[in-house]
Amino acid sequence: MRNLICICGEIMNIIDEIRNYEPFNAQEAKDKELIVSCLRNMEHVFSRDNKIAHMTASAWVVNQRRDKVLMAYHKIYDSWAWLGGHADGEFDLLKVALRETTEESGIKNIHPVSENIYSLEVLSVGGHVKHGTYVSSHLHLNVTYLLEAEEHESLSIKLDENSNVSWFSPEETIRASSEQWFKENIYNKLTVS
């Protein structure tokens, strides 16, 4: 019973954090409603056990001068993209964004510019094969955090997910991505936020 109370408390904290987030645009306002609804009404939202929708956290990683953004070339999407990944049972989504950034880029000296959510979005993921197993189409209920890293720290590639990691100017992030929806609705938004 104590674990259930703890989990409910963690979910309520995240719902409050998302409810307090001021949407940047209409996409974020609608996605905010959907994320809160899923958190309130669906089970296992912090686990991939929920095959319909689950929580993820992304990182918009900038250098200290704020003139470069760190991106990885994701094999599944065949595109340059921000860093991030699944909550996988972790309720601290900032911790997820930090963990995924380190895993995908090798950068260890990284910190949040703010502990508040930087953006949020519901991302549709098309069906794909991962580690030899088919994964059906589903939704990522995503929150993004603004992180800062040292641009000159050595980068490393997470070979099972990425084929490259590199710094780009904010404008180059939009051109580098081959995912039109991401370019128009996410990277465009993040470069001006």
Residue ranges of model-derived segments:
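Unchanged
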Residues: 88-181
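Acidic, metal-coordinating catalytic segment for phosphate/diphosphate chemistry
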Residues: 20-58
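Generic N-terminal amphipathic, Lys/Arg-enriched alpha-helix
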Residues: 11-22
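Short, flexible micro-motifs
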Residues: 81, 87-88
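Charged phosphate-binding loop/patch that engages nucleotide di/tri-phosphates or the phosphate backbone
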Residues: 178-193
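Short, Lys/Arg-enriched N-terminal segments with co-localized hydrophobic residues
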Residues: 2-11
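Basic/polar N-terminal segments that are highly enriched at the extreme N-terminus
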Residues: 1-3, 192-193
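N-terminal strand-loop-strand
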Residues: 47-82
